[in-house]
Amino acid sequence: MNRTKLVLGAVILGSHSAGCSSNAKIDQLSSDVQTLNAKVDQLSNDVNAMRSDVQAAKDDAARANQRLDNQAHAYKK
């Protein structure tokens, strides 16, 4: 009887320990997901900021090309 209680107690304790271990892993994974979400948000913000910089560079290049075209046209006259 005592041996059965001891074995049963060991099984319960073992399964409880495994449950705590799983919860710790789940908590760690949840923390990792939150960290990755924060990084994705930061990268998304960086990409959006770069889009406006790229558009400004394209606009500057277009204006420079237009000036060069105007100068080339003036030399041909």
UniProtKB/Swiss-Prot annotation:
Q: How does it sit in the membrane?
A: Lipid-anchor; Peptidoglycan-anchor
Lipidation residue positions, type N-palmitoyl cysteine? C20
Annotated positions of the N6-murein peptidoglycan lysine modification: K77
- Gene Ontology terms: cellular component: cell outer membrane; extracellular region
GO annotation terms (biological process): lipid modification; periplasmic space organization
Q: What is its main location?
A: membrane
List the residue ranges forming a coiled coil, or say none. Answer: 26-74
Q: Name one Pfam family in it.
A: LPP
**Can you tell which superkingdom this protein's organism belongs to?**
Bacteria
In this chain the sequence repeats are located at 23-33, 37-47
TM region positions: none
Q: Which InterPro entries is this protein grouped with?
A: Lipoprotein_leucine-zipper_dom, MOM_Lpp
Q: List the disulfide bonds.
A: none
Q: How does it assemble?
A: Homotrimer.
What does the protein in this record do?
A highly abundant outer membrane lipoprotein that controls the distance between the inner and outer membranes. The only protein known to be covalently linked to the peptidoglycan network (PGN). Also non-covalently binds the PGN. The link between the cell outer membrane and PGN contributes to maintenance of the structural and functional integrity of the cell envelope, and maintains the correct distance between the PGN and the outer membrane.
What's the name of the protein? Major outer membrane lipoprotein Lpp
Q: Give the organism's phylogenetic lineage.
A: Bacteria, Pseudomonadati, Pseudomonadota, Gammaproteobacteria, Enterobacterales
GN (gene name):
lpp
